[in-house]
Amino acid sequence: MREINNFLMLSSVAAMFVAAPFAAMAQSEEKSFPSAEKIEYVVEVKDSETPAQLTNVKDLYDNAPGVFTFRGTSRRDMPQSGTLKARPSGIKRVWTFQTAFDGRQTSHGTWGGGSGWTGQPLYVEWPDSLMERQRKESTGLTANFSKREVIVGSLSGDVYFIDYESGRASRKSHKSGNPIKGTLSLDPRLNGNLYIGQGIPASQPFGAEVFNLFSHKRTSFFGMDAQAWRRWGAYDPSPVVVDNFVLRLSENGTIYKLTASEKSVKTHSLMRFRHRGSKAYGMESSPAVWGKYLYFSDNIGNILCVDIETLKPVWHYDNRDDSDATVVIAEEEGGVYLYSSSAVDKQGDSGYSRFVKLNALTGELVWENKIACKKIQYCEKAREGGMFSTPLLGHGDCEGLIFTNMCGMGSDKGSFVAIDRASGKVVYKKHLQFYAWSSPVALYTPDKQMFVVTGDVIGNLYLIEAKTGNIIYTLKGGNNFESSPVVIDNCIVVGSRGREIHKFEIY
């Protein structure tokens, strides 16, 4: 994993953006664009003693020993990629871990176990000093605790800790109390804080929590926010840490800026917003960060850039429909850009998934590809069309491309799509056996050939040659891969609906 990460860092245009511009940005005067005037908002400061300014805007996840948040970094660009010795030919199962099963009936159905959308596992390679500390302090370790650990939230309402090598429990599970749909986030400052968001209220209290791995205890719980502009208190977004702050988004339509230590978490400030003339909507996608700016999309299609220091909107873009896929930030020749696309939800049975590339600093549209999609009938329900998968940037022999899964694009199933990042044009699309919400991950050979693994909702895993879209191998590997995988070495770890977390080898 380290070898390919070094290649990506060297080959990326990110090398052009040295520390000085980031520092200048952090100290720049507050600025907003006319598009931000479309947003009605309030900012509430809860802690006036702690300065709101950022002292460092580097991406803390770039040097984290593993994959600590959804899509790896605060840019959500998934630079953590697998390594292959040669062109791969197949996928095989290494181990399967069984979760509990939650049979409670909720107002939103029964959720069972395993993992759902987005449900990406985290991965950590513990430094020796923290291995020793945890062996001394933690009451939750098992005999299988080791240096390489997988952490995943389950629809059963539990958080599981798994030894990467053996697939056995590395710690006692943590009972969160309600189904967890989204992706957890581990603090890259290595203070042991694990940020957990509950997704479905099977019981009360319902909300978000912080669990500390060193003490193996819950240190904070945040329940329903009575002042929120939306009365749905789920926390599917994966929090992100910037400097000394934790940024947590909620489906209640609020951005929370927190300060967190090993023993306590406090709200520093918060921002509530809505499009003028509209009701408030929530966020299921995870926030991205570049410099001192926070980026995200919501359930009606608002794409916002917010100043992290002030929590005031900088710019707004209307993408016209529910946008559940997480935005991706990319540093390219000519600037910093944001990629996003929408679902087909509010439009009716058919419409467009609007895949857009925006100037991340101004919100100006670079290009838009209106991809015709439709809702899909499955299990007597209409499933939304469009994009739920978070896009993957191409590197190596696929530099200049971006990949994603689309639902209902020209068929009742799903499509794996490659798009040219310069023009927005579809380079190719390959039909999958069914629709896919899972986000693709990349693996590279020594000569920088890119291969992709992605899953669909009937349990297929696809091994794809990224340059051509050729599907090399398909494995029926689970019940339903809504969850996104994490890639480690030449393997992936991914959960499925039901009761399973799997490790697969790409060979």
Task: Please report, for each region that a protein language model flagged, where it lies by residue.
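Short loop/turn segments that connect beta-strands within beta-propeller blades
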Residues: 163-167, 212-216, 259-263, 307-311, ...
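Bacterial N-terminal signal peptides
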Residues: 11-21
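C-terminal structural cap/anchor segments
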Residues: 418-430, 436-437, 441
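Aromatic (tryptophan-biased) beta-strands that constitute blades/sheets of beta-rich domains
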Residues: 28-123, 128-144, 148-149, 166-178, ...
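Terminal-region recognition feature
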Residues: 76, 157-160
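Bacterial N-terminal signal peptides that target proteins for export
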Residues: 1-12
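Signal peptide processing junction and immediate N-terminal pro/mature segment
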Residues: 22-28
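Repeat-blade elements of multi-bladed beta-propeller folds
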Residues: 67, 116-154, 158, 179-208, ...
